Amino acid sequence: MFAPLLKKLFGSKNEREIKRMLKTVSAVNALEEKMVALSDEQLRGKTAEFKERLAKGETLDQLLPEAFAVAREAGKRVMGMRHFDVQLIGGMTLHEGMIAEMRTGEGKTLVGTLAVYLNALSGKGVHVVTVNDYLARRDANWMRPLYEFLGLTVGIVSAFQPPEEKRAAYAADITYGTNNEFGFDYLRDNMAFSQDEKFQRELNFSVIDEVDSILIDEARTPLIISGQAEDSSKLYIEINRLIPRLTQHIEEVEGQVTQEGHYTIDEKSRQVELNEAGHQFIEDMLTQSGLLAEGESLYSAHNLGLLTHVYAGLRAHKLFHRNVEYIVQDGQILLIDEHTGRTMPGRRLSEGLHQAIEAKENLNIQAESQTLASTTFQNYFRLYTKLSGMTGTADTEAFEFAQIYNLNVMVIPPNKPLARKDFNDLVYLTADEKYAAIITDIKESMALGRPVLVGTATIETSEHMSNLLKKEGIDHKVLNAKYHEKEAEIIAQAGAPGALTIATNMAGRGTDILLGGNWEAEVAALDNPTPEQIAQIKADWQKRHQQVLEAGGLHVIASERHESRRIDNQLRGRAGRQGDAGSSRFYLSLEDSLMRIFASDRVKNFMKALGMQSGEAIEHRMVTNAIEKAQRKVEGRNFDIRKQLLEYDDVANEQRKVIYHMRNSLLAAQNIGDTIAEFRQEVLDATISQHIPPQSLPEQWDVAGLEASLASDFAMKLPIQQWLDEDDHLYEETLRERLIKEITDAYNEKEDQAGEDALRTFEKQILLRVLDDLWKDHLSTMDHLRHGIHLRGYAQKNPKQEYKRESFTLFQELLESIKRDTIRVLSHVQVRREDPAEEEARLRREAEELASRMQFQHAAAPGMESDLQASEEGAEVAVAAAPVRNDQKLGRNEPCWCGSGKKFKHCHGQIE
């Protein structure tokens, strides 16, 4: 009850932060005259001066006012653009590691230059992250003259870039690229066989453009580098033939069965489940087709792979629809980003789902893949020392940014007040009535000379709208995943008088819609335009611009509400940029997905109570509130799913960091002889203890087993039984010493034959190979564990705790296997002198061959919904936080940071 009063007295946290920053803005403004008086050379020289002052102990915070003043003056001279005061606040927000929410058209790209310039002075590199290659290249080339004027270098990273070019881009002061490329390069670096092959430096400071798209929308999507696994395309084809014979089981709300069937669909969680009748039916069909042995169950351990194929086929047919979740282009399945409407070339669904869709569409089925390396955007971006971001819509997700990334959101006030009118939603009974109303609104707006942007949620809807408009004879442009190449061109002219554009969701995001059209695009379309032509184009544009403003600006029409309020706000934000006039209106029907699944009953009852007739619309605050409540419910559920994904991945991430740290230490080490000697000692001790338990009687010794193990692991055929028979004084400790001496001498002899330098190089390469192979297998094992762990909930066990416990056991086994397999390979190897240059060339050829077979993909985050549900149904056990390691150095006898309960030296300290 006191919160509103306190807010009135002291202002909101956002207002207090802005008030604090305004003092620094005044300091920057006070330096403006001084900067204006400097020559270009003197202004450029400020960069070297700042670097020198940093080296002498000054901080970036102390340099900020002067550095911002320098960047502002450079912007005026090079770009013809001066940073507004609110843009200075935006720059400070980014520098302080926060998210700046700025409305469309407020100059986010220019704001970024302030924080980027300041942080690039440290020489540690700055990464500017965008959602696609087009924006990365556009922004880098747009701002390059400014940075180069100030003496900084700019690089761009992209897919299929030559290694040397990419390495140079990362070495630049400022590097632009997409979130995908930065993430994949991180994974590639941790698969490199030498330091020279690595691309990235330390992850210092990152500015993420459209941060909500990358850290929220993409958060559930793992980045995966994979290699081909065994071919099972015939199985997908067989399963695909069986799926259409299954029927859906449907029940009404009261539980009355209206259609007996084999499976149920939960639209809220996007899950499909076989019921008992379905399991029996599918088992019978699989038995008849010879895929399942007579009398066997699908749930037998050796048939679980077959069950996975069945569910993949079921999901492909019942949850994935052509032109909604994917399109077919050039014989390939291209997934559609539900948030932007863009296709995602190269991205494949995991767990055989992509292959199942290929079988459904009668396409060539590509081989399944095996994970070689993986991470998530959540974990990758948390590796940066400082993280920041910009977007037009972050405030609705402020809680998630704070919880997951420790990022606060600052709402930056606009330079000019918002003049856009946001009309109440109109809700109709049927979709046909809704579309008719949209066309009426379009006609009225176009008659006034206003440009109109119609936002749709799917390609299917955009094409349906297009067909309706064609019947009416209304000229329009369609922007969706099918016409991705024309995106920038269509968006550029979407603000022309009377222009009508249909866009799937937020396709074209990152490009402003300028009222009157884009005169620069018109100039660019001409070959060698004269100054007179350019002047004429600008004059014509000015007239059109004024004409559109007087008509009321851009009118945004949405054909339905999205699950997320943020996506709705992004669509609205296309109108009313920089204080321009504009308006928005959402048209809904009870047949829309969101309304049908989440909000229909309450609204339907309300509409019935009003006695609404066909063609009538309801425009009421209660309806809008009901819809927003439904959206909040979906947002909350999606947040829980993303949070749960992170909790599971945090376990894998700690293991990933340990393995990658070990790998990087290996690459940096010149000599790992001592490490190999330690491994040999530990493996030998474990082998001896396994067959000759400590403090045991000779009668309890398994001498034959020890001889066999030494022959297997160390390639040493030692007559241990003969030694014992000949020497009565040979007891446990002296036997252990003799075995160590024999094996060490044999290895030293091998070193003498090969040469110390050659063997050290060979040891490093073997350890890297063993580590990579076992890590790859470990990832596969972790995947299997992860996808089945939710079933523990039915046994009244907490799935997260079980996953954490079992994954730790698996990791301990991995560490032991790395040591044992490395020693086994080194012990069995036959010494053959090879020219070092030939050896290096051979290894490089093998690495290139491996790289050629790799796939860089995003897997879906499959099964998260069912996992979430199962864990809720399981035991009510308090879930411990996922293990987080701080930077403090642990003593070897202290409890390990991972939460295993073991001492550090017996746990993760073993490999550090």
Swiss-Prot record:
Topology of the protein relative to the lipid bilayer: Peripheral membrane protein
Reactions this protein catalyses: ATP + H2O + cellular proteinSide 1 = ADP + phosphate + cellular proteinSide 2
Organism of this sequence: Pseudomonas entomophila (strain L48)
GO molecular function: ATP binding; metal ion binding; protein-exporting ATPase activity
Enzyme class of the recorded protein, top EC level: translocase
Manner of cofactor binding, per the entry note: May bind 1 zinc ion per subunit.
Subcellular locations according to the entry: Cell inner membrane; Cytoplasm
Family: Belongs to the SecA family.
SUBUNIT field: Monomer and homodimer. Part of the essential Sec protein translocation apparatus which comprises SecA, SecYEG and auxiliary proteins SecDF-YajC and YidC.
Gene field: secA
Chain residues that bind ATP: 87, 105-109, 512
Cofactor names: Zn(2+)
TM annotation in the entry: none
GO cellular component: cell envelope Sec protein transport complex; cytosol; plasma membrane
Residues engaged in binding Zn(2+): 896, 898, 907-908
HAMAP family cross-referenced by the UniProt entry: SecA
Protein known as: Protein translocase subunit SecA
EC number(s) given by UniProt: 7.4.2.8
A biological process from GO: protein transport by the Sec complex
Function: Part of the Sec protein translocase complex. Interacts with the SecYEG preprotein conducting channel. Has a central role in coupling the hydrolysis of ATP to the transfer of proteins into and across the cell membrane, serving both as a receptor for the preprotein-SecB complex and as an ATP-driven molecular motor driving the stepwise translocation of polypeptide chains across the membrane.
